[in-house]
Amino acid sequence: MIELCSVEKVFGQLRAVDKLSFKIFQGEVFGLLGKNGAGKTTTIKMLTLQLKPTAGEIFFEGRAIAGNEIFIKSLLGVVPQHLNFDQDLTVEENLELHARLHHMKKSARRERIDELLKFVELERVRKSFVRELSGGMKRRLLIVRALIHRPKILFLDEPTVALDPQVRRKIWELIENLKAQGITIVLTTHYIEEAEALCDRVAILNRGKLAALDTTENLCAGRTLEEKFIELTK
């Protein structure tokens, strides 16, 4: 479980995140929604230890971040919005490099890479250079890379941005399969229907504050999630 307690982040005169308090439960798909500038990216960066909160605390499995950074980082897999592969390495070489960064033994690296490439149906392109892959393949490869060290928590920042509907559905299937394996998933998305389809609960942020937090069913209450989102973020 992840718990945020009165978390704030201030940049100069800008209060990007304002006293956020909520819990993310083990094994759920948790969505963070909000307009541009609502605080989603800043919140994700604090949850993935890329930024330190100005105030408040974040707990992972009951442990505060301070003094537990190595343990907490071992729990996390992060899929960024922007592609950050070495385009001149092959699929296999990129994954091998990342596995080494996690100090995985050679036999374990091989086994895990084979397992994950099969899982996301990228076995046939393992020897291809990353620059040769389609956008959908690169998105799936980002997910594989984040899963290489068997994290318990996976952060997905806009995982289907700029993908066509068919490829987006394939990513959705991957996320559903990961949830079935018991992995906790935290995702940000601009696609309201994506949150509605995938998330057990959704937090809607507005101007750095928590505007709503509930299941998609309870948030909608006879309306669409998009209508509720528009109402809360005016």
How should these model regions be labeled?
Residues L213-D214:
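ABC ATPase "signature
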Residues R150:
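Conserved catalytic motifs of ABC-family nucleotide-binding domains
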Residues F129-L133:
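Conserved ABC ATPase signature
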Residues L154-D157:
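Catalytic Walker B motif of ABC-type/P-loop ATPase nucleotide-binding domains
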Residues E96, R100, S107-V125:
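Conserved ABC ATPase "signature" region
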Residues G56-G67, F71-I72:
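Conserved ABC transporter NBD signature motif
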